[in-house]
Amino acid sequence: MPSFDVVSEVDKHELTNAVDQANRELSTRFDFKGSDAKFELEGYVVTQVASSAFQLKQMLDILRGRLGARGIDVRCLDEESPLENLGGARQKITIKQGIEQAVSKKLIAAIKASKLKVESQINGEKLRITGKKRDDLQAVMQLLRKTEVDLPLQFDNFRD
């Protein structure tokens, strides 16, 4: 039976490239000359360091632009509130990986409401969709693309 997986993943290599490009842009921008503003990447957490909260907002715009240019959907960003002290300001931005249980249940409910003849099951942070016809699976893909979710969804592991 044909099947496919619904996942929400970010390519680590593209993320590294986007952060490097954002750091390069910071070094060339006039409004950041002489400041110690920078992006640091550890795993899937990007830390912004700047001298003020205002600069953090500008840096976030730079990061979003670079992520978009590298093909990474900015809906995967989970921004914490900025921390300010005398030495400067910091903000952590977590890159969301995988589909949470609540979001998976919402997607499954949308699939069931469409009355398509497919089965869906949760496999950890993935969602496996199985059906008898390829056309049904393609209809589910269209449905999931239209569904309002705050995560970027990708489809992989398509089996016939």
Curated annotation (Swiss-Prot):
The lineage of its organism: Bacteria, Pseudomonadati, Pseudomonadota, Betaproteobacteria, Burkholderiales. The keyword Nucleotide-binding applies. Keywords: Nucleotide-binding. NCBIfam families: PRK05412.1. SUPFAM superfamilies: YajQ-like. One of its GO terms (cellular component) is cytosol. This is Nucleotide-binding protein BAV0791. It holds the Pfam family DUF520. It comes from the Bacteria. GO terms for molecular function: nucleotide binding. The keyword Acetylation does not apply. Signal peptide: none annotated. Nucleotide-binding protein. InterPro entries: DUF520 (IPR007551), UPF0234-like_C (IPR035571), UPF0234_N (IPR035570), YajQ-like_sf (IPR036183). Belongs to the YajQ family. It comes from Bordetella avium (strain 197N).
